[in-house]
Regions:
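Zymogen propeptides
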Residues: 44-85
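A substrate-binding/cap region within the structured catalytic cores of diverse enzymes
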Residues: 92, 104-164
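C-terminal motif of bacterial Sec signal peptides marking the signal peptidase cleavage site
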Residues: 12-14
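Short, basic, glycine/proline-bearing loop/turn elements
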Residues: 31-38, 60-67, 119-127
Length: 164
């Protein structure tokens, strides 16, 4: 009986469905023939979203970038994070938008959220910097704050930058 349960669990986990890809939001590139294609630049192979996730799921670290003002890039980052969460435990998420002085706030907000106490203004509670459009970054940050893995600062503070 145990073997049947184990095989069933393995088969069901292999059939996990990726989150739906986000709808395109921005006007940029809408008439480009390659809009939405995922291309492996090493060999020009076109990948499906599932193939991309399968290739990335065993990576120890991923560096994912975006054009800071492109809503589609932000939506795809959140999609990729959620897709990878379905395939493996995440280690942590580091954001260049977070500076060392904000880490204590991030940790405090996370504890509050887990205790069921959501701040009225999440961006303000995190001391989110105005230069990073919260409307674009907020969905990813909000999602990450509710996960079991840490959300960490990856930027240097002003004093650290000035000392270089």
């Amino acid at each position: 009986m145990r073997i049947i349960v184990l095989v069933t669990v393995v088969l069901l986990s292999a059939c996990s469905v990726l989150p739906a890809l986000p709808e395109w939001q921005g006007p940029e590139g809408r008439d480009h023939a390659d809009l939405g294609l995922i291309v492996d630049l090493r060999n020009d192979a076109v990948l499906t979203p599932a193939q991309l996730v399968a290739r990335l799921q065993d990576s120890e670290a991923l560096l994912v970038g975006e054009r800071h003002d492109n809503p589609d890039h932000h939506a795809l980052q959140l999609w990729l994070l959620q897709a990878l969460e379905q395939q493996r435990p995440q280690g942590s998420l580091l954001l260049e938008m977070l500076e060392p002085g904000q880490q204590a706030r991030v940790d405090s907000v996370r504890r509050d959220l887990r205790a069921g106490h959501a701040p009225g203004d999440l961006a303000q509670a995190l001391d989110w910097q105005k230069g990073w459009d919260w409307n674009l970054y907020g969905p990813l940050v909000s999602h990450a704050l509710m996960q079991s893995y840490p959300l960490l600062q990856a930027n240097l503070g002003r004093d650290e930058i000035m000392s270089i």
